Amino acid sequence: MIILDFSQFLPDIGSGFIIGFVIGWAAKKAIKVVAFLIGIYILSLLYLAKIGVISINKEAFSALLGNLENSLLVFGDKIIGLIHSFSFGTSFLIGFGLGFKKG
């Protein structure tokens, strides 16, 4: 009969969860700050365009947003590959999810 001592796995599980929670919480806070700054920037551009100080090339702006979307998708794929390479990936993902939810 094989007796398994689960206490040897606790440091990996616990550290993965804690690291995931902190990174998830920080990621959500960072996303909120970046979204706020982008919103302020876009609003300032729209205001300047409305009063005639600048002119916005709508086609180039749409292309820029499309390129940004593709870049974010590629970055997301790389992050997923990185998470899968962690030995404590499951607890990391659970911690990340909870940290993201709480952040």
UniProtKB/Swiss-Prot annotation:
UniProt superkingdom: Archaea
Protein location: Cell membrane
Tagged with keyword Cell cycle: no
Main subcellular localisation: membrane
Claim: Metal-binding is one of the keywords in the record: no
Transmembrane portions of the chain: 6-26, 34-54, 79-99
Keyword annotations: Cell membrane, Membrane, Transmembrane, Transmembrane helix
One CC-aspect GO term: plasma membrane
A Pfam family it matches: FUN14
Membrane topology field: Multi-pass membrane protein
Family: Belongs to the FUN14 family.
Protein name as catalogued: Uncharacterized protein MJ0067
High-level lineage: Archaea, Methanobacteriati, Methanobacteriota, Methanomada group, Methanococci
